[in-house]
């Protein structure tokens, strides 16, 4: 873990419950946060002095749970034309990646009655997951 990255967590409820396979969803969240950390580390190879940050937001309302992970890493630079390609198996931007991580994340989210969206932002990336209750 990179101790120089600020991780900010915001939630609108102390108790958010979802009927799920907790092991599978834990892997989803771990994979997405790990990707954010790696993206920030990759950016820091070229830009030495920036405020490294990951923001995690978890919100619940009557019919859905929304998770948003935002980072200020390199973003989806290789997927500007078609952001959905980020979900294709064996597509990777990492030196040692397999390209399976996000396709597995997508399948797991879909299996849990959810939808994932990858949103390019000016300085980084945003991932939004909505689980229907």
Report the location of each language-model feature:
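A residue-level detector for a conserved hydrophobic packing site
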Residues: 25-26
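Detector for a conserved hydrophobic position within an alpha-helical segment of the HATPase_c
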Residues: 109-110
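Short conserved segment of the HATPase_c
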Residues: 76-89
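Conserved catalytic submotifs in the C-terminal HATPase_c
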Residues: 6-16
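Short alpha-helical Gxxx[C/S/T] motif in the catalytic ATP-binding
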Residues: 101, 105
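Conserved micro-motifs of the catalytic ATP-binding
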Residues: 17-20, 93
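ATP-lid-like helix-loop hinge signature
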Residues: 36-62
């Amino acid at each position: 873990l990179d101790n120089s990255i600020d991780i900010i967590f915001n939630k609108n409820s102390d108790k958010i419950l979802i009927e799920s396979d907790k092991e599978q969803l834990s892997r989803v969240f771990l994979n997405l946060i790990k990707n954010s950390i790696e993206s920030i580390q990759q950016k820091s190879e070229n830009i030495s002095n920036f405020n490294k940050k990951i923001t995690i937001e978890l919100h619940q309302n009557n019919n859905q749970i929304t998770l948003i992970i935002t980072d200020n890493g390199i973003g989806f630079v290789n997927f500007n034309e078609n952001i959905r390609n980020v979900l294709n198996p064996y597509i990777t931007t990492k030196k040692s990646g397999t390209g399976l991580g996000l396709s597995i994340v997508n399948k797991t989210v879909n299996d849990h009655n959810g939808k994932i969206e990858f949103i390019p932002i000016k300085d980084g990336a945003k991932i939004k997951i909505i689980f229907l209750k």
